Amino acid sequence: VELAYYSDLAVRLVNSEEPARGTDSLTSVEAVRALFGESQSAARRATDADVTRLRSVRARLRAVFEAAASGDEVLAVDLLNALLIEFPVSPQISGHEFRDEDGRPKWHMHIADYAANAGAGYAATASMGLAFHLTELGADRLGICEAPPCRNAYLDTSTNRSRRYCSDRCATRANVAAYRARKRLDAERSASPPRRPSSDRPDRGARTGRTADTAHDSIPATDR
């Protein structure tokens, strides 16, 4: 199965909207067709109705990423299973369009869908691709960008599971913001007067000019 291609369909759809910034690029049938990328035969089936269909699927796929990113693997799996049930696929062996250097077919598993419309077909392949990614690499490989205000989804393919941002641009922006925050904190600490150690502070008797002994001596004998 072309894991990277199919799972990327889910990321592409989720990131067509940036809720924190109030932007949404999925507004026309042309935008729907652009999501399909190389699958032009499927893209040609798209209609205006698929805009609404895919927006609904997009919200559900984002919920999968959000659940996985928060550590709730069970919820992520349940949400994804619901999509797989609603949008089934049929795996097939394919390879006629790919040839090796000797001209022989490069056989591979292909996710075929028989959906009634382009939106359902996209949902089927995107959901199955994400399911393969989750089961093969782990739910913790599904992430949400940690560089506010960005909330883009991403698939972590790093060797040490260390990815935290959707892009190099967001990673750089987050690092710069963290650096500036540290510099501000250092400046605030430098501007504050140092606190005197408790050992250097005069005791109450010293502040009043009286020692414990003189205070004792001033008490009338009848009160002692």
What positions do the PLM features span?
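Cysteine-rich micro-motifs
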Residues: 161-171
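Short helix-coil boundary/hinge micro-motifs
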Residues: 1-144, 148-155, 188-224
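Short, glycine/charged-enriched secondary-structure capping and boundary segments
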Residues: 159-161, 181
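Short metal-binding segments enriched for Cys and/or His
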Residues: 174-184
